[in-house]
Amino acid sequence: MVPAICRFSASLALGIFSASVAVAEPMTVGAVDKVQAHVDATQAGQVRPLLINSDVYFRDRCHSGEDARLQATLKDGTQLTLGENATLVIDEFVYDPIRPRGKLLIRVIKGAFLYVGGLIEGETGAKVWIQTPVAAIGVRGTTVWGGPIDNGYGVIVLSGEVTVIGKKRTVTLKQGQGTMLFKDGKPQRAAAWPAGRMKRAVASITFGKPPGQ
């Protein structure tokens, strides 16, 4: 089986035939599992709606609207959930199903997200990074939430371990620990979150019940 390899620095292969230029199709890296309200993706300047079973492509700019949610699963089993008014791009995806290890770089431009790790993390992780507006998050065997909350930006680990690299400080979070970043960009020391903050974080990426339920 051919490994799925997409890199941030990769250039498109161009084929020129009869004075026309054929550009390689974008590579599929996953598919949509669930959608609430309006969610779309932009690829090479073209916007398309994301629906259940829609393909997710390398370098798609996935965006959720007001009261929207998106849940997608990548080819290695990594699961990504977006809250409302969120934007995310997969900048690097290297995965070989025969050797379950590779590299994943996710850029969260805005909004709340939930990341549930897949096979790319392998035995040690360390090759999965999530870049947020205020910090870089190194992931190991992890379920992690991040997003704007309580007038700052929060990161909370539900399982596994992450390293949060902000301005002038790096913090390691283990299961049940979170951190907050405010205007100074310095992550606070790891600590359990208050119940109210935790509830708001979970609500930000939770799908609403369908009508009639």
Predicted regions, residues:
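N-terminal secretory signal peptides that target proteins for export/translocation
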Residues: 1-4
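Elongated, non-catalytic scaffold/linker segments and compositionally distinctive motifs
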Residues: 6-8, 37
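Bacterial N-terminal signal peptides
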Residues: 9-19
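Flexible, surface-exposed loop/linker segments and immediately adjacent secondary-structure boundaries
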Residues: 24-213
